[in-house]
From Swiss-Prot:
The keyword Acyltransferase does not apply. InterPro entries: C-type_lectin-like, C-type_lectin-like/link_sf, C-type_lectin/snaclec_domain, C-type_lectin_CS, CTDL_fold. Disulfide bonds join C26-C37, C54-C154, C129-C146. A motif (Galactose-binding) lies at residues 119-121. SUPFAM superfamilies: C-type lectin-like (SSF56436). Residues 1-23 form the signal peptide. The lineage of its organism: Eukaryota, Metazoa, Chordata, Craniata, Vertebrata. This is C-type lectin galactose-binding isoform.
Amino acid sequence: MGRFLLVTLSLLVMAFFLNGANSCCCPQDWLPRNGFCYKVFNDLKTWDDAEMYCRKFKPGCHLASLHSNADAVEFSEYITDYLTGQGHVWIGLRDTKKKYIWEWTDRSRTDFLPWRKDQPDHFNNEEFCVEIVNFTGYLQWNDDSCTALRPFLCQCKY
């Protein structure tokens, strides 16, 4: 019995420290993931204003970049839980050259692009910023006018 209690207690302590290692430095209400902290903001902003808002937290903060299906699923659940409205959500991807060359604001690799069907399309030659689409369960992306007002997802390295 004593050995079982010791093993159980050791496992609980280890789980506590492992969980703390991932979330110890994120501000309250931010989601810890992959060494970054993420937060969805319900304020409606243009893509540029959203990026500037994210940058105000500290150097290295940007609109979020997503790099895997696991990221997409995690953020889908997080956005669904914390977004008070039902709008699409800005992320940190855009086509600054307007030639279907998509780049993240944090300069990370563009290695995951779960576009909605028939997207991106640069509709009317006006859509160069990327949003996560609400009616896909926040799992697929669309290009939209950078001046549209949207909630947004920030990421910061803490």
